[in-house]
Amino acid sequence: EVRGKGKAKAKPVTKAPPSLSKPDKVLWPETDEHDAVTKADLAAYYDLVAERLLPHAANRPVSLVRLPDGLEGQRFFQRHGMKGMDLPTIKIAGDKQPYVTLESAEDLQALAQAAALELHPWGCRPNEPEIPDRLIFDLDPDEGLDFGDVVDAAKTLRGLLEALGATTFIKTTGGKGLHVLVPITGPKAKPPSWDEAKSFTQSIAAALAHEEPERFVATMSKAKRKGRIFVDYLRNGRSATAVA
């Protein structure tokens, strides 16, 4: 909610759930642009977006970025379940510990309780972690580029993919980059393996870098990325994640 020319007001859309401890704990500190955002605000936000968020994260392995003391405190990345965390888990072949997953809006409230500010699910089918259900191109710009450059790059990539018959969607990442997503759909289509998904997206990234080397690069090398956009295809490997 924005009031006049003042700061953006973080206003919960629901009351904090009874199970939420320390609901007034500040996770995002107050700035000149917005008021402080509390644990209760995070719970309310998850409640608000549950219907749209869960189809992209539920029943998949999910890695969490947790900040128990807010943005000014320590952060850590969590993949596996742990005692005291009221979240379902999913078994992954080759891993002794099950991964955290989500099944319901109530699980999102548990994320608020755990101060999980970011969700990074696998790009797999629900309950089928060995089968990709989307291709992800992460457009990662050099620091000197503007967001408009990334938007133009996304349009270029979308044009290339749609010329191949793919349906594409654009997703923000929370930073300066963008994700270009290609859903893998069709009941008659044989789904690709993780290796095939990674190989295909790598070939697209390489094609862009070859056709427009002044704009795109398909390697992680910092030196080669100067003034360019890295077309990151590595999020299509098994166990790789992308922010929800």
Language-model regions: role of each:
Residues W28-L42, D138-V150, P187-A197:
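Short histidine-centered catalytic/ligand-binding loop motif
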Residues F77-Q97, D146-E162, V182-R215, R235-A244:
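Helical (often loop-to-helix) elements that flank the catalytic cores of nucleotide-handling enzymes
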Residues V26, R52, G70, K83, ...:
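Short loop/turn segments at secondary-structure transitions that flank enzyme active sites
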Residues E1-T14, G227-F230, L234-A244:
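Intrinsically disordered, low-complexity regulatory tails
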Residues P17-V37, T241:
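Acidic, metal-coordinating catalytic segment for phosphate/diphosphate chemistry
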Residues K11-K15, S21, A43, D47-F147, ...:
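SsDNA-processing nucleotidyl-transfer enzymes
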Residues V65-L67, T168-G174, T219-A223:
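Short beta-strand
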Residues T172-V182:
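Short, conserved phosphate-binding/catalytic loop or strand-edge motifs used
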